[in-house]
Amino acid sequence: MTQANIHLRLAVPEDVPALRELINKSVRGLQTLDYSPAQIEGALQTVFGVDSQLIADGTYIVAEAERNAIARDEAAPQPFELIIVACGGWSKRKTLFGSDHWTGREDALLDPLRDAAKIRAFFVHPDWARRGVGSMILQACEDAARSAGFTRFEMGATLTGAKLFGAKGYVAVKPISIPLANGELLPVIHMEKQA
């Protein structure tokens, strides 16, 4: 599957049910080598999920592909339908990570001259992992943040996501342990990059 088969667009509120399903599949399908089942369950209840503020701000991107693009039978074409296969965003707000359920939110606006834009909430469907979709979204986020005047980016990367972000020039700054609703701790990595 080439990147030409992927369409990027801004997320809209009507995408939330599909995003919830995608996030659940992404976390359960791709993060099991880096996190325990208890950490995954706790994270899905606390920090992994939809952040409606990113959608409202127009800074959350979805990648769409044809529903049957992976295993399509050309002899028996099926109706054209796009599905969301990945998502990710950037923020002009202080919150570094967290979904609508996260209580540690800081919704104050950042100053592009002093602060780093936040790269946020990247999730890829397991069937679309390692196909360049996350990289496409990351590039679009960085370009949009640059256009808004930001010269630095930072994130709280999962142990799984840190591999991609490291390959894209992000540098680990420090480990972070996020307390989860079920008493577990979720290790993530604070990463930064110059624009």
What are these regions (language model features)?
Residues 24-50:
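Conserved GNAT-fold acetyl-CoA-binding loop/helix
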Residues 11, 120, 156-157:
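Small/polar loops that bind or transfer phosphate-bearing groups
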Residues 158-162, 168, 174, 178-195:
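C-terminal "cap" of GNAT-fold acetyltransferases
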Residues 71-129, 139, 144, 177-187:
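Conserved acyl-donor/pantetheine-binding loop and adjacent beta-alpha core of acyl/acetyltransferases
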Residues 7-21:
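A short beta-loop-alpha structural element at the N-terminal edge
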Residues 47-62, 66-74, 93-97, 118:
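A short helix-loop-beta-strand connector motif used in the catalytic cores of GNAT acetyltransferases and
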Residues 132-134:
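Conserved G/P- and acidic residue-centered "switch" motifs that form tight phosphate/ATP-binding loops
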Residues 138, 145-158:
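Conserved GNAT acetyl-CoA-binding A-motif
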